[in-house]
Amino acid sequence: MGQGPRSPHKVGRRFPAGGKRGRGAKGSGRPLPGRKRQPWPPPDGRSEPAPDSHPHLSPEALGYFRRALSALKEAPETGEERDLMVHNIMKEVETQALALSTNRTGSEMLQELLGFSPLKPLCRVWAALRSNLRTVACHRCGVHVLQSALLQLPRLLGSAAEEEEEEEEDGKDGPTETLEELVLGLAAEVCDDFLVYCGDTHGSFVVRTLLQVLGGTILESERARPRGSQSSEAQKTPAQECKPADFEVPETFLNRLQDLSSSFLKDIAVFITDKISSFCLQVALQVLHRKLPQFCAHLCNAVIGYLSTRGSSVDGSPLLLFLRDQTSSRLLEQVLLVLEPPRLQSLFEEHLQGQLQTLAAHPIANFPLQRLLDAVTTPELLSPVFEELSPVLEAVLAQGHPGVVIALVGACRRVGAYQAKVLQLLLEAFHCAEPSSRQVACVPLFATLMAYEVYYGLTEEEGAVPAEHQVAMAAARALGDVTVLGSLLLQHLLHFSTPGLVLRSLGALTGPQLLSLAQSPAGSHVLDAILTSPSVTRKLRRRVLQNLKGQYVALACSRHGSRVLDAIWSGAALRARKEIAAELGEQNQELIRDPFGHHVARNVALTTFLKRREAWEQQQGAVAKRRRALNSILED
C-alpha cells in the first residue's frame, strides 16, 4: 500500500467522519428508518389499549399524589415520621395502582414512589396490578411502572428475608405473596405468551428488564436510562455507576431465566427477523453470557445454525446475506460479542474468511465486522483478519467507515501484535508516511480524520512528489475539530507498546494547539491516555505536557480542560505543582470567578499557596509521600 503515483481519488482526501458507535448518526452509513434504538418505548404503538379500558385518575387524586411525593422528597431521609408517610402514601397507591400506572403523569410519579417504597408496600402494589399485567405491560405508561418495580429488586432482595421475619412476628398487613413469588408469577405470565410480549412495542421492554432481573445483572443501557421525572440529583449519577451491576438472586430466578431463554429456541426465526422481538434475544444473550455461559453458547449456535442454512449466496456463506440485513445484523453483532474465542475462530473460518473487505465496504455489514474486531483476543484470529483488511485501510476510511479501522487498531492493541505495521499503514492512508518529515504531523490528522493535503489546504497534482512538511505552516494552523473516532484512534495508539511517534507528534503541537486538544470533549481523552498509558514514561509525559505552560489558566477555566488539569495535578511531582500553582496564582481572581476555575483553585489550595507558602509545601510534600507509599504497595 505504498504511495507511488497517486490516483485522482487519493489526492486531497477528506475522510468522511463515519458513524458513532450508535447507528443512524450522520455519515455512519447505517440507514435511519427502523434502526433507531429508543431509550424508552415510543409514545404510541400497536399495543395501546382503548381509552376507556382502564380506570380514570381524577384530578383530585393526581393532586394528592403530587403533593405527597413533594412532601416525601422534603422529609428527612430516615426516621419514624418518614416511614409512616411512605406507608400511608403507598396504601393510597395500592387502591389506585392501575389508574396511576396508565396515566402519563401518574405513572411518572409512581415510578418515583416505588424508589422510596420498602418491600411490603411494593409487593402490595405489585399484587394489585397482578390481574392486569397484560394491560400494564403493553401500555405506553404502564410499561415504565413495571420496569421501575423490577429494577427495585437489587435494593429489596437483600431485605426480603428480614422483612418476612418481621411480618411473621406482626402477623398482619402482609402481602399474600413474597417478592420472589411475584417476580416468578410475572415470568410465568410472560412465558405463557412469550411471542406476544416480545413482539409488542411496549411489552418487549418488560421482557428485557425481566431477563436482567432474573439473571441478577442490570446492563449498562438500563442503568444509564433516565426514568420518568427523576429529580436532578438522580439524573447526575456518575458515569462509572452506569456499568453492568450484578446482584444475588434466588436459584429459582436462574431456573426461570433458563425456561424463558428456551422459549427463544421454539420460534428462533421470529426472534431473528422481527425487529422488536430481536431486541429481547439480544438482551438475553448478554445476560446469559454473564450468568449461564453454556446456555448462551447453545443459543448462539442455534442462531448461527439457522442463518447458515437459510437463503443462498453465490459469493460465500448464507450468513453473509444476514450480515447485510438491518434487523438480523444487530443480532449477529451481539452473537459475535458473546461467542467464546474457539467458537469465534471457527465462525470466522467457516463463514467470514475472505469476505472482510466486502463487509467493510457495506453500509450495514461494516458494523458486525466492527464487533468481530472488538471480540478478537487471540493472535490466531487477528493474523488472518489483519491480512485481509490491511491492504484496504485507506479505501475503508474513504467510504466513511472509520469505525472498522479504529476497531482493527484496537484489536492490535489488545492482542499486542501488528502494532508497528498498522501504524505504518495509517501513516500511508493519511498521506503522511513520505516524506518522513510529515510524520510529525500525524496527531492532528488522526484526530480530525483528515488526509495531509486536506488538513493543510494543499493542492497536489497527480504523480507529483509530495512536499516536505513545513513546521511554520503547521504551527500557524489552529487545531481542527477533534472527532470522537479520531480521539479513540489516538488513545489506542498511545497504549501501543512503543508510542514514540505519536508522542513526538504531540510534542510538536504548540501550546494553543495542545490547549485546544485538552479543551475538546473528545480530545481531552487523548490527554487522559497520555497520563494513564503504561507505555508512556514519566519523562516522555513531561516532555509533551510542558507545552501547556502558559495555558494553565485557560485550561482551568474550561469544562473539559479543568478535568485534564486535575488529572495532571494528581500525578505531578512537587516541583511541577509549584510551577502550576505559581502560574494559576497570577490570575487568582479570574479563577475564583470562573465556574470551573474556582474548583481548580480549591483543589490546588491556591489561597494557601499565595498566603502561606511554607505550609502549602509541607502539605503537598505529605501528599506526595502518601502517593509514593501507595504506589509502592500497589506495585508489590
Swiss-Prot record:
<dbReference type="GO" id="GO:0003723">
    <property type="term" value="F:RNA binding"/>
</dbReference>
<feature type="compositionally biased region" description="Basic and acidic residues">
    <location>
        <begin position="45"/>
        <end position="57"/>
    </location>
</feature>
<feature type="repeat" description="Pumilio 6">
    <location>
        <begin position="547"/>
        <end position="581"/>
    </location>
</feature>
<feature type="repeat" description="Pumilio 4">
    <location>
        <begin position="351"/>
        <end position="386"/>
    </location>
</feature>
<dbReference type="InterPro" id="IPR011989">
    <property type="entry name" value="ARM-like"/>
</dbReference>
<feature type="region of interest" description="Disordered">
    <location>
        <begin position="222"/>
        <end position="241"/>
    </location>
</feature>
<dbReference type="GO" id="GO:0005730">
    <property type="term" value="C:nucleolus"/>
</dbReference>
<dbReference type="GO" id="GO:0030686">
    <property type="term" value="C:90S preribosome"/>
</dbReference>
<dbReference type="GO" id="GO:0030688">
    <property type="term" value="C:preribosome, small subunit precursor"/>
</dbReference>
<dbReference type="InterPro" id="IPR016024">
    <property type="entry name" value="ARM-type_fold"/>
</dbReference>
<dbReference type="InterPro" id="IPR040000">
    <property type="entry name" value="NOP9"/>
</dbReference>
<feature type="repeat" description="Pumilio 2">
    <location>
        <begin position="189"/>
        <end position="223"/>
    </location>
</feature>
<dbReference type="GO" id="GO:0000447">
    <property type="term" value="P:endonucleolytic cleavage in ITS1 to separate SSU-rRNA from 5.8S rRNA and LSU-rRNA from tricistronic rRNA transcript (SSU-rRNA, 5.8S rRNA, LSU-rRNA)"/>
</dbReference>
<keyword id="KW-0694">RNA-binding</keyword>
<dbReference type="GO" id="GO:0000480">
    <property type="term" value="P:endonucleolytic cleavage in 5'-ETS of tricistronic rRNA transcript (SSU-rRNA, 5.8S rRNA, LSU-rRNA)"/>
</dbReference>
<feature type="region of interest" description="Disordered">
    <location>
        <begin position="1"/>
        <end position="59"/>
    </location>
</feature>
<keyword id="KW-0677">Repeat</keyword>
<feature type="repeat" description="Pumilio 3">
    <location>
        <begin position="313"/>
        <end position="348"/>
    </location>
</feature>
<dbReference type="GO" id="GO:0000472">
    <property type="term" value="P:endonucleolytic cleavage to generate mature 5'-end of SSU-rRNA from (SSU-rRNA, 5.8S rRNA, LSU-rRNA)"/>
</dbReference>
<feature type="repeat" description="Pumilio 1">
    <location>
        <begin position="92"/>
        <end position="123"/>
    </location>
</feature>
<feature type="modified residue" description="Phosphoserine">
    <location>
        <position position="7"/>
    </location>
</feature>
<protein>
    <recommendedName>
        <fullName>Nucleolar protein 9</fullName>
    </recommendedName>
</protein>
<feature type="repeat" description="Pumilio 5">
    <location>
        <begin position="509"/>
        <end position="544"/>
    </location>
</feature>
<dbReference type="GO" id="GO:0000056">
    <property type="term" value="P:ribosomal small subunit export from nucleus"/>
</dbReference>
<comment type="similarity">
    <text>Belongs to the NOP9 family.</text>
</comment>
<dbReference type="Pfam" id="PF22493">
    <property type="entry name" value="PUF_NOP9"/>
</dbReference>
<keyword id="KW-0597">Phosphoprotein</keyword>
<feature type="compositionally biased region" description="Polar residues">
    <location>
        <begin position="228"/>
        <end position="238"/>
    </location>
</feature>
<dbReference type="InterPro" id="IPR001313">
    <property type="entry name" value="Pumilio_RNA-bd_rpt"/>
</dbReference>
